[in-house]
Amino acid sequence: LMIIGEGEEVNNEVLALFRQAQQAGWSKTRFLETAAKIQGVLIPSFYVPHWNPDGTLHDLTPTHGAPARVTKRIIQDLDACYYPTDPIVPSTEIVHDRVNVELFRGCIRGCRFCQAGYVYRPVRPRKPETIIRQGIESLKNTGYQEATLLSLSSSDYRPLDEVCDGLLEYCEPRSMSLALPSLRADNFSMDIMSRLQKVRKGGLTFAPEAGTQRLRDAINKNVREEDLLHSCQVAFEGGWNGVKLYFMLGLPTETDEDVLGIAELANQVLHTWRMHATNKARGVRITVSTSCFVPKPHSPFQWETQVTMDEYKRKVQLLRESIRAKSVTYNWHDPDTSFVEAVLSRGDRRIADVIEEVWRRA
């Protein structure tokens, strides 16, 4: 049984049906046949695949009364649906060791590499009072000292000032920090930054994605170099001394000039710090991180090729040799993971054994 779309509502419907089936002693087949009538529920075993001579899928024949097409579930009112404000807190340190609160779902942008920006349409914001309540309740229940406001592009949330003020009113007396990931360099403001610096400063992260304007235009990122440098200037003038920059290697039409442009952009950020930082005694930390482009289904780049592992490693080495400033740290993602991700994301039901093998190999 698989659920297509967003699960907050349909999860409860399936679980309620499962409890009913257990209490009534239904067979597995009867349970699945009934579940298939719920919008968003896909029963793969109820569809017989037919293949083209080249191995691609021709069509699926539904059986057991299953619908010919499964319609994904979309939450229309995020304020009314369940949100876990008392999640299980792990007993060991984890990567995202903080409270996460969703600002809105979807994205007003249209980056051509981004699957999430297309599959989570339309854009649906939460009300400011809902976000503030969920954030405060989560902090109280978990004991975490940091809250992150999540979305595909946090600074595109219009009432962001109101949310920051409401959460900081609770966080500031308790020395808790508030983070805004996924900031866009073209709408980062001093007003937002002044709210964040009321408590201890977290890191600032920008994702230019590509090193040159030509390539950023090609992927529809729509962030200009002057926007990024101005945002960094605002941050450095406000007392920040650390910036993380995220890029992708292997994007369609990418050349070595684009790769070298990443190093040049990092140098420009460093120069901006030297010119505008208010506290140079602490130094500056500029972190450049790259990942390997993965062509994702349901994105405009879904049919693009992925660079070979050797080519990705060559690009990484080229960039490593180009970053010479001691204040700039370069991190890159393991290409093996990106290639597995590409295979799994573009596969069909025949990839099931591969998924199991990947899981067994951790």
Where are the regions a protein language model picked out?
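Flexible glycine/acidic-rich beta-alpha junction loops that bind and position SAM and/or redox cofactors
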Residues: 48-52, 158-159, 188-192, 214-219, ...
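Iron-sulfur (Fe-S) cluster-binding segments and ferredoxin-like electron-carrier domains
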Residues: 114-130
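Short secondary-structure boundary/capping segments
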Residues: 2, 18-20, 118, 162-168, ...
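Conserved structural-core and active-site-/substrate-pathway-adjacent residues in large, well-folded domains
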Residues: 2, 41, 81, 106-107, ...
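N-terminal pre-triad scaffold of radical SAM enzymes
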Residues: 89-115, 139, 180, 292-294
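Conserved SAM/AdoMet-binding glycine-rich loop
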Residues: 132, 136-287
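N-terminal [4Fe-4S]-dependent radical SAM core
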Residues: 44, 50-100
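Glycine-rich beta-alpha loop elements in corrinoid/cobalamin-binding modules
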Residues: 1-62, 297-348, 357-361
